[in-house]
């Protein structure tokens, strides 16, 4: 994918998606592209390490942070072959669905608008990740 800004804009055309980020996880654990001014632009290398690390038990019990926002994990198949998606929900009064998909070199992180069901984001992430995998990203 040459132009991530165009990709981010295309993803944000879906009115159910509030924020999006492309984050490296293989070579460079930082945000490659995101919605300007969005919460997901603040995803840290430490958060990427927790998401992709081998210790799944700890964050399944205690939750995790995405862009500094605390989340509870609903379903974790991020490291599973053939799936590669994690579903979570932010904590607090403004709870939103968060979905993380894994491609060979990058994570795709989506946050839905308030009231959008996580299953919708999950389906969208699966479709987008399939495209990223074909591109080799």
UniProtKB/Swiss-Prot annotation:
Gene Ontology biological process terms in this record: actin cytoskeleton organization; positive regulation of actin filament bundle assembly; regulation of actin filament polymerization
GO MF annotation terms: actin binding; lipid binding
Keywords of this entry: Actin-binding, Cytoplasm, Cytoskeleton, Lipid-binding, Nucleus
Top-level division of the source organism's lineage: Eukaryota
Name of a matching Pfam family: Profilin
Subcellular location: Cytoplasm, Cytoskeleton; Nucleus
Gene3D superfamilies: Dynein light chain 2a, cytoplasmic (3.30.450.30)
Tissue specificity remark: Testis specific.
Main location: cytoplasm
GO cellular component: cytoplasm; cytoskeleton; nucleus
TM stretches of this protein: none
Family designation: Belongs to the profilin family.
Function text: Binds to actin and affects the structure of the cytoskeleton. Slightly reduces actin polymerization. Binds to poly-L-proline, phosphatidylinositol 3-phosphate (PtdIns(3)P), phosphatidylinositol 4,5-bisphosphate (PtdIns(4,5)P2) and phosphatidylinositol 4-phosphate (PtdIns(4)P). May be involved in spermatogenesis.
PANTHER family: PROFILIN, PROFILIN-3
Subunit and interaction comment: Interacts with ACTRT3.
Descriptive protein name: Profilin-3
Source species: Homo sapiens
